[in-house]
Amino acid sequence: MEAALTKLDQEEKRALQAYYRCAWEETKNIINDFLEIPEERCTYKLNSYTKKMELLFTPEFHTAWQEVFECREFIINFLRLITGHRVVLKGPAIVFTKETKNLGIPSTINVDFQANIENMDDLQKGNLIGKMNIKEN
């Protein structure tokens, strides 16, 4: 019985991970569509060091997203919809809170928009430098 439960838990985790991957892809696409510009301004990746997902923005979008009310509200509402979490804007951070079953999903996720300009070569080349880090609390 315990082995069956473990197998089910693993399948649930895989299904949930697949769902979150789809949610991140959809978030990226919708943000890019919402900005109505031909170039991609947003993408996402799994940080292999921290094992956390990151949304990456170009510098222009990173500095502007909070100043555009409709864009900020849209992103918050969309993240609320796809994650099922309660989403709150706290200064420059978006905070998700929700109790979940023990599927390896933290009950509180802090999404902190921050600029990463440690590598000036990246900045000069116009590479993505804005990050949205998901941190487990």
From Swiss-Prot:
Induction: Expressed in the late phase of the viral replicative cycle.
Keywords from the UniProt entry: Host cytoplasm, Late protein, Virion
Keyword Aminoacyl-tRNA synthetase found: no
Compartments (UniProt record): Virion; Host cytoplasm
Gene Ontology, cellular component aspect: host cell cytoplasm; virion component
Subunit and partners: Interacts with host TBK1.
Family that this chain belongs to: Belongs to the asfivirus A137R family.
Protein function: Plays a role in the inhibition of the host innate immune response. Mechanistically, promotes the autophagy-mediated lysosomal degradation of host TBK1 and affects IRF3 nuclear translocation to block type I IFN production.
Record protein name field: Structural protein A137R
Native source species: African swine fever virus (isolate Tick/Malawi/Lil 20-1/1983)
